[in-house]
Design a protein with these regions (language model features):
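Short loop/turn segments that connect beta-strands within beta-propeller blades
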Residues: 119-122, 155-159, 194-198, 259-261, ...
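Loop/turn-rich, solvent-exposed surfaces of beta-rich toroidal or solenoidal domains
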Residues: 374-454
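N-terminal "mature head" segments of proteins
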Residues: 2-171, 485-493
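A structural motif specific to WD40 beta-propellers
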Residues: 126, 161-163, 200-203, 263-266, ...
């Protein structure tokens, strides 16, 4: 009886102080008490050796039943058990890219210039690439594009057909048509090449020797930086070759090119002498639309005093144009048919954010008046052209439309005081939040890792882990590449 009483005391103290040692001691003491009780109950009915064996067996069974299941139930998850693919850990300076296609492969570019293609179907595929090569995925994720010394090599995902090599630097890949720019003896030309019949170009037009490239989508850039962007700078930064070909003419400015004919589409997108940023982005998400609109070309031009004017085009025609923003020192991000500017307004030192979108001509704070009535934010996990993801004082992770402030979805956190770490990218949220210890055998330092499809808040992967995570890289399709010091794993999808 004394042993059983001690077991009860240990169980109570362990539950109160959340001490695992006391909880285990309670199970062992309960087993010992049960064995002693059986020994006393049997008395002299059996031989001594038999009585001892039965009592010891009961003690072992009771102790195991009270400890082993409890220990197993609180063991943290292992990343590799939920992994779609496992590869070497990510290091500083290594890039991870995914195409907007939801389940396309993931391109990993290592610091030494080597590269890997990762997918659920083929696992980890090592790519032959020199450090100076530019590697990118097509916008639909079905092809890999490799540029070496002005030679473009296009490989179909899965190796269904032989790679196609085309002389020149790629500007875009629209379906099966690759638009390239090649120069020889001071003469430059643009060509459209059907990858199904690459021997003869579909069309060829002359191009100026002086040119520049568009800007990377979703990347924060100085608004008034007059430095010319290289033809492949955006492709190298995003790891994706766009499907809309954009051409810079030093006499006219920026033009959109029809990949089927090589002719300019619509009006001049931005004048040659203006300080403008330009990129082709997906259209803003519209849940009410029966069919998603095609890509849009965004421009944002800076005036002499730093005021910004943003314009959205579709097929060379203006969809909307913003009014001038307040003058100031701004960086801009072109993403999902909207322009997000961060910086300081002239005459102030406080940094803020303003947004230009299809909603109205005036620049406004992200979320507009739609988030004015929302509960106070405690942290922001990320923002892009479509949504911003925040945490609030009620212990929730909430997504709002970046332009309208409309509530999109909500997920719970473990507690309002939980420390939260994570990020938003490629329409995916990766969040790591602390878990409160509620049971004595819960390990210390547990955190819950969730990969969330930012489009609708669907959790595509969820683990409770005690591992030290060094990198959280969100990817398209509700996936993420998570790295520790020992390995990196692809989760979600």
């Amino acid at each position: 009886m004394v042993l059983l009483a001690l077991a009860g005391i240990c169980a109570l103290l362990g539950a109160h102080f959340l001490l695992g040692a006391l909880r285990l001691a309670a199970g062992l003491l309960a087993g010992a008490g049960a064995g002693a009780f059986l020994l006393a109950l049997l008395g002299g009915r059996l031989r001594r050796r038999m009585r001892v064996l039965l009592a010891a067996g009961l003690a072992l069974v009771v102790a195991a039943a009270l400890t082993v299941p409890a220990v197993l139930a609180t063991r943290p998850d292992r990343l590799e058990r939920a992994a779609i693919a496992t590869l070497a850990p990510l290091r500083e300076g290594e890039a991870v890219h995914s195409a907007p296609d939801e389940q396309g492969p993931v391109l990993v570019r290592r610091a030494d210039g080597t590269a890997q293609l990762v997918s659920a179907e083929s696992g980890v595929e090592e790519l032959e690439a020199a450090p100076e090569d530019v590697l990118a995925l097509s916008a639909d994720g079905t092809r890999l594009v490799q540029v070496t010394d002005e030679l473009t090599r296009v490989s179909e995902r899965g190796g269904g057909s032989a790679p196609v090599e085309v002389p020149g630097t790629p500007l875009a890949l629209a379906g099966d048509v690759l638009v390239v720019r090649a120069c020889e003896a001071g003469t430059c030309r643009l060509s459209g090449v059907d990858l199904g019949a690459p021997d003869q170009p579909l069309w060829t037009v002359s191009d100026a020797e002086q040119t520049r490239g568009p800007d990377p989508v979703g990347t924060e850039l100085p608004a008034g930086d007059g430095a010319a962007t290289g033809l492949l700078d955006a492709v190298a930064a995003t790891g994706v070759l766009p499907e809309v070909p954009l051409r810079f003419d030093p006499d006219q400015g920026w033009l959109q090119v029809d990949p089927a004919t090589g002719f300019a589409v619509g009006r001049v997108l931005a004048p040659a002498d203006a300080e403008c940023r330009i990129a082709a982005t997906p259209a803003p998400s519209d849940p009410q639309a029966l069919q998603q609109r095609g890509p849009q070309v965004l421009t944002v031009c800076a005036g002499e005093d730093g005021e910004l004017t943003a314009t959205a085009h579709e097929d060379g025609q203006v969809l909307w144009e913003s009014a001038s923003s307040p003058a100031g020192d701004w960086t801009v991000r072109l993403d999902a048919g909207r322009v997000l500017a961060t910086g300081t307004e002239e005459g102030t030192t406080t940094e803020g954010e303003i947004l230009a979108s299809e909603r109205q001509s005036a620049w406004e704070a992200p979320g507009g008046q739609g988030v004015d009535q929302a509960e106070a934010f405690t942290a922001r996990l990320g923002i892009d052209g479509t949504r911003m993801v925040v945490t609030n004082a009620s212990g929730q992770m909430v997504a709002y439309d970046t332009a309208t402030g409309a509530h999109l979805w909500t997920l719970p956190l473990d507690s309002p005081d939980a420390e939260v770490r994570g990020g938003l990218g490629a329409s995916t949220v990766v969040v790591l939040d602390e878990i409160r210890r509620e049971h004595p055998l819960d390990p210390r330092g547990l955190r819950r890792l969730r990969v969330v499809d930012a489009a609708d808040g669907t959790v595509t992967a969820e683990l409770v882990t005690a591992e030290e995570l060094t990198e959280l890289r969100p990817l398209s399709g509700g996936r993420a590449l998570i790295s520790t010091e020992q390995q990196a794993v692809l989760l979600g999808g």
